[in-house]
């Protein structure tokens, strides 16, 4: 798979299919099956699978242009492909050879979509408060789960769930690979979460009450018991670049809306863009976008190279890009004034979507605390 060809195909898909339809999808809170099928057919869900497991073996940096362009259409689409990318990173970096052979070729072929689940009602960024448990089956078959999970990305129709749980035999959480064939059955209740923005993409809540999953196992096998938090945070380096690309796509659209207002909206004898204050706002949007873009590109390269700085850079890129996205939408909305408050207006949707990037893959304030911690402890 040529990354440039992928980007070109995504650009055409966004222009021809997404932009003409996104207002209706957002209003109806739907991601049509055909659209998700198209994302799979484009190769976006299996792009990170290595060649020796049947995938194209692309890196995160290869996907930045495609993720960004997809987000110019709708960030929900970029979010829809993200959990399977996280699962791929988990399997490639931490899976046993048997787990890799079981799942990666099917992800590459578009036969399997995954979910990623850390958050619980009482535990978001504080992984030490995880309460979901997984005990060994009575005859040593699989795991028995109890507990609750929230904000399970892709958690309604995925084929496999990677979730953080306290597993019998370890004093720290482990990453459980949970086939989803039992979802909705005995001991596994499902509820879909209605959202203000970031609509269409699945966000689920789970309740486990003694759910026996014969095929469930610990990622990396028993040797990796207690390593789940480290494994899943490692994969989130990939996810934070994905979220940062969502933010870049929002910034791109906010800038386009601002330019349209400046050149199309008549003010007195001229247009809005004739006024210095409007030009200053557009110029600042261009400057801040360039800074966010450079940081995202640098972070993606660091994640691919497994640099020591990858965690810090991917976190910083996500924080800076998402804060810039919310800021840029606000600035564009000020230029558009009442137009941006009308139902169905693109800026009205962006106002609802942009804050998701400040929350997804870690709330920004929690991430800033994590960035500060090693520097303060080393002082």
Predicted regions and their residues:
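A short, Trp-centered hydrophobic/proline-enriched beta-strand micro-motif
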Residues: 110-118
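Glycine-rich phosphate/pyrophosphate-binding beta-alpha loops
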Residues: 72, 123, 150-155, 356-363
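Glycine-rich phosphate/cofactor-binding loops in nucleotide/flavin-utilizing enzymes
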Residues: 86, 336-379
């Amino acid at each position: 798979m040529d990354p440039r060809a992928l980007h070109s195909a995504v650009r055409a898909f966004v222009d021809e299919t997404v932009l003409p339809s996104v207002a209706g999808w957002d209003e109806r809170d739907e991601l049509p099956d055909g659209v998700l099928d198209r994302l799979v057919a484009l190769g976006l869900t299996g792009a990170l699978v290595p060649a020796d497991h049947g995938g194209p073996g692309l890196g995160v940096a290869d996907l930045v242009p495609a993720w960004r362009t997809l987000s110019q259409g709708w960030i929900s689409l970029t979010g829809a492909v993200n959990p399977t990318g996280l699962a791929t990173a988990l399997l490639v970096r931490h899976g046993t050879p048997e787990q890799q052979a079981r799942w990666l070729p099917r992800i590459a072929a578009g036969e399997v979509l995954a979910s990623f689940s850390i958050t619980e009602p009482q535990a978001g960024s504080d992984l030490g408060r995880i309460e979901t448990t997984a005990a060994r089956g009575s005859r040593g078959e699989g795991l028995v789960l109890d507990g609750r999970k929230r904000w399970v990305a892709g958690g309604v129709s995925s084929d496999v769930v990677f979730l953080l749980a306290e597993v019998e035999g370890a004093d720290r959480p482990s990453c459980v690979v949970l086939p989803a064939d039992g979802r909705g059955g005995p001991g596994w209740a499902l509820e879909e979460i209605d959202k203000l923005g970031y609509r269409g993409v699945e966000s689920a809540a789970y309740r486990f009450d003694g759910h026996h999953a014969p095929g469930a196992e610990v990622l990396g096998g028993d040797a990796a018991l207690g390593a789940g938090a480290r494994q899943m945070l490692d994969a989130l380096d990939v996810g934070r670049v994905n979220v940062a690309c969502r933010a870049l796509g929002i910034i791109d659209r906010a800038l386009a809306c601002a330019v349209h207002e400046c050149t199309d909206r008549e003010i007195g004898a001229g247009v809005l863009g004739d006024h210095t204050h409007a030009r200053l706002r557009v110029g600042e949007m261009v400057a801040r976008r360039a800074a966010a873009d450079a940081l995202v590109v640098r972070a993606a390269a660091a994640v691919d190279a497994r640099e020591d700085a990858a965690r810090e850079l991917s976190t910083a890129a996500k924080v800076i890009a998402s804060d810039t996205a919310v800021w840029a939408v606000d600035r564009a909305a000020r230029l558009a004034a009442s137009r941006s408050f009308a139902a169905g207006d693109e800026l009205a949707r962006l106002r609802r979507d942009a804050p998701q990037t400040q929350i997804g893959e870690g709330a920004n304030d929690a991430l800033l605390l994590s960035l500060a911690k090693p520097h303060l402890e080393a002082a």
